[in-house]
Amino acid sequence: MNGPRHDTSLFRERDVVPIRRALISVSDKTGLLDLAASLADAGVEIVSTGSTAQTIREAGHTVTDVASVTGFPESLDGRVKTLHPAIHSGLLADLRLASHEEQLKDLGIEPFELVVVNLYPFVETVASGAVDDDVVEQIDIGGPAMVRASAKNHANVAIVVSPADYAGLAAAVAAGGTTWGQRRELAARAFAHTAAYDGAVAAWFAGEAPDLSAVAERFEVRAEWGQPLRYGENAHQAAALYADPAGCGIAQASQHGGKEMSYNNYVDADAALRSAYDFAEPAVAIVKHANPCGIAVAGDIAEAHRKAHECDPVSAYGGVIAANRTVTLAMAETVRGIFTEVLIAPGYEPGALELLKTKKNLRILELPVGYARSLTEFRQISGGVLVQDTDRFDEFDSSGWTLVAGAEADAVTRADLEFTWKACRAVKSNAILLAKDGASVGVGMGQVNRVDSCTLAVSRAAERAVGAVAASDAFFPFADGPEILIAAGVAAIVQPGGSIRDEEVIASATAAGVTMYFTGERHFFH
């Protein structure tokens, strides 16, 4: 069955559409009263349902109930409210066609120029652990129908699905109406919104996330419009942020101050979080171009930041800082004196936040409660998508490491080796990381051979390499890499092992009296 076709020569020109009548039905009441006030001040008739109508009416604004428009009461515990020709004819009438206008008059139906709808909180209900029957009740039917009808008819109707668009809508109403371009952009967001919603429902019925241990028939990603970004990785690239409606990460973080986040800011901040949140202890990671230039743990977060910054102060200039604890006033006082692009943490002491806000360009982000990395990750390639389990340390335990050279590490050295192994995972391959006293002192990242990574790490550590420990994200194919580390004074090395020349590598460490452990697990990061 196909939709009707119209002779486009019959279409009348319609760009700016004044708002005279609006249909509002929202679950999320954020910004509702300000929007209703702006519409009422402009003389717009507001038609609404249930609790939305009650909220607007209690604020002192006149509201027309949907039931008085349809002549049919809300029924079946609210399951049927707006599913009626008196509503949908007003949403779908294409008033560029004289015939549609005449039919509305014959039917006694008034058109809508604005629809404001957000859907039942299905994802939030699932996340709350609700029983199946309660989850099913949060599958919206009438809402998506109104959204899709309005978006289809964007030539005549503006559809708004997010409180983030209320301010722009109010400005358009005050300016005399919405333009065709505005309505088309809103329609695109609306269809993305309903697609993500339906995808969430389908995923729930299918049993949530795909099991990657078997071949899944289909992999779906759900994301909703978040915000436009000034540009992408470079100024000539367009970019935007889309957020997982069920996510609890950087895309959902609150910003307390500073300039707008950029594409590169988000990439670096996410990389910094990946580094800092590998540790149970207070930890700070400083990142530049998605690579750590300092990672450290300590008894308190301010000391962790001091140690992380000391690793490479030159590279830390203009970097992104992530902390896995509440930022204290002591840490804020130090950060305030360093040019930093982004600071992200789970919280801020009141005094710390006020101090940081004096840095007008510093982007201050606060993670949502319950921050967690996704269990799966994907990367787009030409013609498809790669999907994998996220690389993470589950119940980290070094007792399974194998001592292959030198003496057993004492408790202090063992703790440093464990720290170094975790920290190295956050470095782009080929990765070598030197550390001492719970802090990185030299990082060799992103080199195309492990010898160059060793050389880079040692050169950055300089005299701090003496007595330090080292980690390699993958095995050493030859003894030349460890020999560079040993010559610089490294006392212990941890690596996966698995090279066909492991015996040569082990012999080199043994001859130098250097402790070496094999973990049996690689941590490439590309």
Swiss-Prot record:
Its EC number is 2.1.2.3, 3.5.4.10. Belongs to the PurH family. It comes from Leifsonia xyli subsp. xyli (strain CTCB07). One of its GO terms (molecular function) is phosphoribosylaminoimidazolecarboxamide formyltransferase activity. GO terms for cellular component: cytosol. CDD domains: IMPCH. Pathway: Purine metabolism; IMP biosynthesis via de novo pathway; 5-formamido-1-(5-phospho-D-ribosyl)imidazole-4-carboxamide from 5-amino-1-(5-phospho-D-ribosyl)imidazole-4-carboxamide (10-formyl THF route): step 1/1; Purine metabolism; IMP biosynthesis via de novo pathway; IMP from 5-formamido-1-(5-phospho-D-ribosyl)imidazole-4-carboxamide: step 1/1. The lineage of its organism: Bacteria, Bacillati, Actinomycetota, Actinomycetes, Micrococcales. It holds the Pfam family MGS. GO terms for biological process: 'de novo' IMP biosynthetic process. It catalyses: (6R)-10-formyltetrahydrofolate + 5-amino-1-(5-phospho-beta-D-ribosyl)imidazole-4-carboxamide = 5-formamido-1-(5-phospho-D-ribosyl)imidazole-4-carboxamide + (6S)-5,6,7,8-tetrahydrofolate; IMP + H2O = 5-formamido-1-(5-phospho-D-ribosyl)imidazole-4-carboxamide. This is Bifunctional purine biosynthesis protein PurH. The IMP cyclohydrolase activity resides in the N-terminal region.
